[in-house]
Amino acid sequence: MPEITTKPRTKVKPQTERPKLYKVILINDDFTPREFVVTVLKGEFKLSEDQAHRIMITAHRRGVCVVAVFTKDVAETKATRATDAGKAKGYPLLFTTEPEE
């Protein structure tokens, strides 16, 4: 009679990695009106008036400010849409993204 071997069953949960997060960064410029920057921050990033104003002032004083952190696709989409809002009005408003450490 042939010998039957069985393998023990092991349950292994597949490990899913968390998606990398990216920072959306506001770059200060000397031409875009502050009120417009606040409006874009409120509209695209759903910030309160106070939050948007603080981010705008921080970027004005330091040259840059992290607006928010998202997954890569969301961060790039929001940065592009916010930058495009400035371009549509003729302003050099610029948002960039970079990986969060």
Swiss-Prot record:
GO process terms (BP): protein catabolic process; proteolysis
Entry coiled-coil feature ranges: none
Pfam families according to UniProt: ClpS
Alphabetized HAMAP family for the sequence: ClpS (MF_00302)
Function: Involved in the modulation of the specificity of the ClpAP-mediated ATP-dependent protein degradation.
Assembly: Binds to the N-terminal domain of the chaperone ClpA.
Family in the record: Belongs to the ClpS family.
Name of this chain's protein: ATP-dependent Clp protease adapter protein ClpS 2
Gene: clpS2
